Design a protein with these regions (language model features):
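Active-site loop architecture of trypsin-fold serine endopeptidases
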Residues: 1-2, 12-29, 35, 39-66, ...
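Short beta-strand-centered aromatic/proline hotspots
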Residues: 3-7
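Short, conserved beta-turn/loop elements at beta-strand boundaries and strand-helix junctions
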Residues: 9-13, 91-92
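Extracellular/periplasmic catalytic domains that process cell-envelope and extracellular macromolecules
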Residues: 10-11, 25, 33-35, 112, ...
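Conserved beta-propeller blade repeats
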Residues: 30-31, 108
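Hydrophobic beta-strand positions
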Residues: 32-33, 150
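C-terminal recognition in membrane/secretory proteostasis and scaffolding
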Residues: 40, 67-183
């Protein structure tokens, strides 16, 4: 393979640089390099099943990777935040995040309701959320109160949410999966 970039894709909940580079468990995490400039444009991360396609690989875009590196450099945990909300695509608008359900009924943490449309972080309105991965990326490194720009019943409003790290599964005594508790 030559590592030819064939496009940017949204797949599995995040943006990827699509390439024909052969990616496997031995080289995942390696750089995807622009041969014209010598710059790293992505971090090779995943491959599509060889049965489905031949040589279809995906790399994390450097914009996302650089943000994680910057957070690490500053001693900030870059882990994805805990988001107690599920999303769906807004009606006939593939470029908006519409709230489908709120898992924790704690309005002081996430005062969102089903059918709210989450637009952007306050102060970053020029970077609107298109997919859930945009929200996750924007909230990386945040710990505490954050303001979201939300549209509810046609009215744009600001809501303060509590951003917190995702709970570590290893800290749990038991895990509930499909009606069974493993402890």
């Amino acid at each position: 393979t030559r590592g030819i970039v064939s496009g940017n894709r949204y797949r599995w909940g995040r943006y990827w640089v699509q390439t024909d580079a052969a990616i496997n468990s031995g080289n995942s995490g390696g750089p995807l390099i622009n041969l014209d400039t010598g710059k790293v444009i992505g971090i090779n991360s995943a491959t599509y099943s060889k049965r489905m396609s031949e040589g279809l690989g995906f790399a994390v875009h450097m914009i996302r990777a650089c943000r994680v590196l910057e957070l690490l450099k500053n001693g900030i945990d870059p882990s994805p935040p805990y988001i107690p909300v599920s999303f769906t695509q807004a009606d006939n608008k593939l470029d908006q995040l519409k709230v489908a359900a709120v898992y924790e009924k704690q309005p002081h943490l996430w005062p969102l309701e089903p059918n709210d449309t989450v637009l952007a972080l306050v102060g970053f309105e020029n970077n609107p959320f298109v997919h859930q991965s945009d929200l996750i990326h924007a909230l990386r490194g945040q710990d505490g109160l954050v303001e979201l720009l939300v549209e509810r019943l046609g009215i744009r409003q600001t809501f303060t949410i509590t951003a917190r790290p995702r709970p570590n599964l290893l800290d749990k005594i038991g895990v509930h999966v499909s009606g069974i508790i493993f402890g």
